Amino acid sequence: MEPASKKSKMGKNVKFNNNKKKYFHAKRQTLQPGQRGFFATCNINEKACVRECYNLLNHYADILYGSEKPENEPEKKQPEEGAGGDAGEDDPKPAAGGTSDDDDDLEAAAAKCREMLSQRKMRFQNVDTNTTNCVFIRTQLEDPVALGKHIINDIATTGKSMSRFVLRLVPIEVVCRANMPDIITAAGELFDKHFLKEPTSYGIIFNHRYNQQIKRDQIITQLAELVNSKNVGNKVDLKEAKKSIIVEVLRGWCLLSVIDNYLECKKFNLAELANPSDKKSSGEGDSKSETSEVANGNDKEQAESSEESKSNDDENKDSTENDK
């Protein structure tokens, strides 16, 4: 039998650990149907990737839409100064029995602050994807694609990506559950916005992580049929599509978006936009051509020297035969 003192200590530790979870394990935001935002990928250091996403999105959102102002922000009241000096000097001291009123006021103020924080809507909020090296930033903006295009165009023109860990930053228009009925329903509403009016060329880009139920051929076939049903003039173009349908499946969730000139913009790869590989490839091609020309010149010189040596050998043979 264990002593009572030891049992009491164990009970206190268990109680302390249970209370500790409330403070040290904050409630995480998770993906939900109907959300929109930005899907980012990285190789290492997800925390740094999230921080860079916040910096990028807030920087360009402030440029486009202005700085973010919290809703229902309380106005700070400044104390009025009396004629004789500070306002606090002439205030009467609270009576001894007024402590309960002060406590009630503090509780009411704390409850009001909690209510304001719960009602406050942040412009960008990190959402847990439960997928390695995949980050999703939820947004309250109506059109995340417009902000994404502005970021990409600015990086392409200036050549400065302002990021080190973020590889791709793709705007997402809708989130749904990763099953075919929900995907077709969400895609149908989305395609009404992009494929109804004028015929265009399109391509489907599908990626899946930690999900084997959604098959590539199945989803591509059904989405292509859905696009053609919106407008018969829509055609598939895998190399130079004007509109790209982005389908990212993360475990039990599917992220959908339709983006113009996605392939021209290096698939929204920030590093590729800041440092285009075309320049590197052209430089490498010039160096390769120069080395090939040098090699060809050396080969010609070697061939000519070998021919001269052969002719010298033939002359020596003829002279020896004449001597004999």
UniProtKB/Swiss-Prot annotation:
Where is composition skewed (Basic and acidic residues) in this entry? 68-80, 277-291, 298-324
Q: Give start and end of each THUMP domain.
A: 154-260
GO BP annotations, alphabetical order: tRNA modification
- State one molecular function term (GO): RNA binding
UniProt cross-references to PROSITE patterns, sorted A to Z? THUMP
- Annotated region Disordered: where? 1-24, 67-104, 275-324
Q: Which UniProt keywords apply?
A: Phosphoprotein, RNA-binding
Q: Which residues carry this modification: Phosphoserine?
A: S100
Which residues does this entry mark as bearing Phosphothreonine?
T99
**Family stated for the protein in its record:** Belongs to the THUMPD1 family.
- Identification of the protein by name: THUMP domain-containing protein 1 homolog
